[in-house]
Design a protein with these regions (language model features):
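C-terminal segment of classical bacterial N-terminal signal peptides
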Residues: 1-7
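Solvent-exposed loop/turn segments at secondary-structure junctions
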Residues: 46-50, 106-111, 134, 139-144, ...
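A Trp-anchored, charged/polar loop motif used as the substrate-binding/catalytic surface
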Residues: 75-80, 227-250
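Active-site beta->alpha N-cap acidic-glycine motif
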Residues: 14-130, 159-178, 335
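Catalytic domains of cell-wall/extracellular-matrix polysaccharide-remodeling enzymes
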Residues: 114-115, 141-239, 278, 311
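C-terminal beta-strand-rich structural cap/linker in extracellular carbohydrate-active enzymes
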Residues: 367-382
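C-terminal domain-boundary segment and adjacent tail
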Residues: 13-32, 194-211, 256-339, 343-370
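Structural recognition of the beta-strand scaffold that forms the well-ordered cores
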Residues: 39-43, 99-104, 133-138, 167-173, ...
Length: 382
């Protein structure tokens, strides 16, 4: 189980390195982690089993499940093929797997029957421990007239914390039959419960310019629904989506894009899901064009990871001290929320000299490309 950050105070961290040539240097915090061009957060809503049987092994590497006829008369499986994984790099020679989020209803997570269509608790835990985000989607996915929205929000937080030991801090409004404006009640109650973001019907995005500070602190954002047409595989519809992403890559500003679907197996569950062949084509195309195999400008990361990076970026202050070839960079972050899971930052170093790290007050691993492109340092705040 990954342990969450528990500090809630100003954090001062030092990174010291030595230049190989005497030159003047400067440094700034990258707009996006690893200095990528586009952050793409893709969420699988409702906690369907295909997140673990299909999406996870495709992205992380492993055997994708063969067809699994399930209790909904659908199919929670894929093509049964072995995947080597889909990756981008951290800009310093290390590869990072594509990761998604699951919007979870804890009240409908179960281990039986064998042909279940939903995730089990052990599967949710595995996804979380592999760096996927688990988002609050309400305890029972209720939206109809008479729903106690506050109870739905809080019960889901409490039950997931009880079962797995972490606190969900991102909310996704559940869809379905509803009263007009019900989403605003969910938004209000989610923020009151400590959520930092809410995915709703209307808000920022789905493509958000993050070249400037992210405002407001409590972010309501919209997402694109990606779904197949009935049970007919159409790769041309995925090509249209890829063209949309390509246009975002051409933006002069860094972009954070949010999209979602439901099931990712072999059947189009509720006609609001993405058939596995289309899901696979989308993800492998992203890898080949914008991941490690392509131009490596894509940060394929889930909502919480991206939001927390942007928060850290907007609240961090850096100072640089240089004495000849010796450089010290101090990074200060005040009032780091105790529920933050990710405290990573990327520094863009403007230097005409290669460099090597000498010392750091950070307890986490630091990566840099000081001996090659000499322009990036990745680290996490204590």
């Amino acid at each position: 189980m990954l342990v969450q950050n528990s500090a809630f105070a100003q954090s001062v961290n030092e990174i010291r390195f030595k230049l190989k040539k005497l030159v003047k240097i400067s440094a700034t915090i990258a707009p996006l982690k690893y200095n990528k061009k586009l952050a793409f957060s893709f969420t699988l809503d409702d906690g369907y089993r295909s997140a673990y049987t299909c999406a996870y092994p495709l992205l992380n590497g492993g055997r994708v499940s063969p067809p699994i006829p399930d209790e909904y008369k659908s199919d929670s499986g894929g093509d049964g093929e072995l995947s080597a994984g889909l990756y981008y790099t951290n800009g310093c020679g290390e590869r990072v797997p594509f990761r998604l989020a699951v919007a979870l209803n804890a009240g409908i997570v179960y281990d039986r029957p064998d042909n279940r269509a939903r995730l089990s608790w052990s599967e949710v835990e595995k996804l979380y421990d592999s760096g996927w985000d688990i988002l609050n989607h309400g305890y029972h996915h209720l939206s109809k007239h008479g729903t106690d929205y506050n109870s739905e929000v809080l019960a889901n937080i409490r039950f997931v914390r009880q079962k797995l030991g972490f606190t969900m801090t991102q909310f996704v409004v559940p869809g379905g039959d509803h009263d007009p404006g019900y989403e605003h009640d969910y938004e209000k109650d989610a923020f009151a419960a400590g959520s930092f973001t809410v995915a709703s019907y209307v808000g920022a995005g789905p493509a958000i310019n993050v070249g400037r500070p992210l405002k407001p602190t409590q972010l309501i954002y919209a997402r694109d629904l990606l779904s197949s047409y009935k049970d007919s595989v159409s790769l041309s519809s995925v090509d249209w989506q890829l063209a949309k992403i390509d246009s975002m890559m051409q933006s002069p500003q860094p972009i954070w894009y949010n999209a979602f679907t439901h099931n990712a197996g072999n059947r189009n569950l509720w006609t609001i899901s993405l058939l596995y062949p289309e899901f696979k084509y989308l993800m492998t195309s992203l890898y080949e064009r914008y991941g490690q195999k392509g131009n490596d400008k894509l940060w394929m990361a889930p909502t919480q990871e991206v939001y927390e990076y942007l928060w850290m970026r907007d609240h961090a202050k850096i100072t640089i001290e240089q004495h000849g070839k010796d450089v010290t960079i101090k990074v200060r972050v005040s009032k780091l929320p105790p529920s933050f899971r990710n405290t990573a930052l990327t520094l863009i170093v403007d230097s005409k000299s290669k460099f090597y790290l000498v010392k750091s007050s950070l307890q986490s691993k630091i990566s840099d490309n000081g001996n090659s492109a000499h322009n990036l340092i990745n680290f996490s705040i204590r």
